[in-house]
Every structure is written in C-alpha cells, then in structure tokens.
UniProtKB/Swiss-Prot annotation:
Residues 333-338 are annotated as: G5 motif. Signal peptide: none annotated. Disruption phenotype: Slow to respond to octanol. Residues 272-279 are annotated as: G4 motif. Residues 29-42 are annotated as: G1 motif. The gene is gpa-11. It comes from the Eukaryota. GO terms for cellular component: cytoplasm; heterotrimeric G-protein complex. GO terms for biological process: adenylate cyclase-modulating G protein-coupled receptor signaling pathway; determination of adult lifespan; G protein-coupled receptor signaling pathway; serotonin receptor signaling pathway. InterPro entries: Gprotein_alpha_su, GproteinA_insert, P-loop_NTPase. Coiled coil: none annotated. This is Guanine nucleotide-binding protein alpha-11 subunit. Mg(2+) binds at residues 41, 178. G proteins are composed of 3 units; alpha, beta and gamma. The alpha chain contains the guanine nucleotide binding site.
Amino acid sequence: MSAADMARKNSLINRQLEKEKIDSKKMLKILLLGGPECGKSTIFKQMKIIHMNGFSDLDYVNFRYLIYSNIMQSMDQLLEAAEFFHFPPDDSPSIRRALNHYKSYKVRYSTSEVELNRELADSLSKLYNAEFIKSVLNRKNELKLLDSAVYFLDDIDRISAHEYKPTEMDVLRARVPTTGITEIEFPFKQASLRMVDVGGQRSEQRKWIHCFDNVNGVLFIAAISGYNLYDEDEENRKDDGTPTKTNRLRYSMELFKRIANHQCFSKKTAMILFLNKIDIFKEKIGKYPLTTCFKNYKGVNAFEPACKYVTDRFSRLVSGDIQHEKPLYTHITNATDTRNIDRVFDSCMDVIFKISMEKVGFM
C-alpha cells in the first residue's frame, strides 16, 4: 500500500472515529427506577407508544395472554379478600356453580395457561357481579388488588371474544413484574435516548448498581396511592418469625433517599421524581387519611394539600449539598394517561438536556 493510500485509509478511520465520538455524545442514558408496583413499566410502555410506533402483532398476542392471567389473578385476590372480610358467597345455585367451575379450572390450568373461553368468562362475570364480591369492591382501596382488576373485569365480554385484540389502553393496564434489565433506544429531538428499566422487586434491586454508569437522568417512580397499603417484608422478621410490615409509600421514600444521594450520580445527572397513580390517590384521599402514612400531617385530606405535603417530604430526603448543585424536579403523574406522560416527559427532557449540556457538549 502506497503512502497516499495509507494516508487516505487513516483519514477515513479518523473520520469514522470522530463520527462515533459525536454519536456517543448524542446518546443520553435515562434510568427508570422505583419499587414494586409503582407504574415504572407502564411509563416504559408509554415510551414505546409515543416514540416507537407502539407494539408488534406478536407483542399484542403476548399481551392478550398476560391480560387473561391478570383477570384470573384479580379474581383470586377478590376471593381471598372476601374470606378475609368474612363475606360468604351468595346463597345462589348460579353463584355456587360459577365458583365451583372457577376453582376446578384453576386446579387444571396454571394462571399462565389460561384460555378465556365463554364458559370461564361467564363464571367470572357471575362472580364479579355477585353481592359478596361487590361488598369486597366497596373496600377495594384497602386491598392489595391489581390496579387493573376493575378495568378488565368490567370489560370481560369484550376481552373474552374470540377475535379479541388488546387496545393500547389494555396494554398499558396489563401488569407484569419487571425482572432483569430491559432497554429501548429511540430518537428524541437532537439526541438518541437509551432508556433502561430495571426490575423493581426487592430481589432485583441489588442489580441496580450495574446500571449507574454514565447516567444523564434518573426517573424515580413512586406510587403515591400506596400511602395506606402495607407489604410483608420477608427480609426483616419479628421475634416470633413473622415478617414485619412496611408501608408502601414509606418504602419508596427510603429507596428514593438512597438513590437521590448516591455518589454515582454527579451534579450532571438530573434527578426527577414521578409521584404516580394520582387517579387512585384522588379516589382514596377523602376516605383514608394521610396520617395513615404520616402521623404528623396536620392538613386536610384533600388532593392538592396532600400532594404538596408528600412532595415536600420527598424533597427533604435529598441532601442540601446536592440540592444546591441541582434541584429535584417533581411531577404528579398518571402513567396510563398517554397525554399526561407525553407532556411530562417532554418537560423532563428539557431538564436533562440542560443539566447534561456541559457533559455531552452538543447544545
């Protein structure tokens, strides 16, 4: 190879390396973090709808069976709650037949194998409309019930139809716990975004540290609606061996405190908090006082003052030194509302672009 050819080759290599360097500067990494059942995966699905043309036909087939599974899980939760509240099944032959059919189906098939045929759908519909289940639903905000339970069971006829294909709202409502690490990449304005969704279950959280390098923005999702709910903490037990109970919102606060003050996130990493599930919170706050979670709360049990109080409590968890370098940005969200998430995410990206400007050097 002549010297001229070698020079041309080196020039091409250098230009390619420079292009890759520029491209890497334009890639922004966004981390989605939060505890179990906070709505994190729903935000992730919204990004696919808003920025990636939604879902494939195969995705919709998989979501169809996931929705069937969610319906069975919801009915299990309602029947367990009826036992807990001591609400006996209606004394009716049709309800007894429906309950027996449902239980025998559960013996034959696992939740993941469900085919929502007409007979099973009829049994589910009869149970859902029975008086003892209505009594449970009157206290649904006290239960650990799938957020989508009423949504799907209300529409059991549509969902059990042979030609059923999930709508986008069905997909957003479908619940599956995130396990492992899932990534998507999509263009946004003058940059490319890599969004990383990390499993929120307690057993998954030890994996989070592996995703903390070169993060431009953290979206931490906390379900504000969990303020009156408690989960069993299998890792911490009482003297008698029974698990301790942890308030869901308090647990999110502890998690957020660790993340927001973590040394891996420099002053150039935007920290953004989504107080999510405000639709459920609005339903609850007039019935279940905020003092369930915050004993020192002195305000009225109304949406706006309660939201402001929770926002302030989260803000106080971030150290003064960090807040001096970069403020905490908080948004009140409903993850199943596409317009709300589109608007909020646009605002978040303005913040991330601004804070990342010095780091990525392309604005």
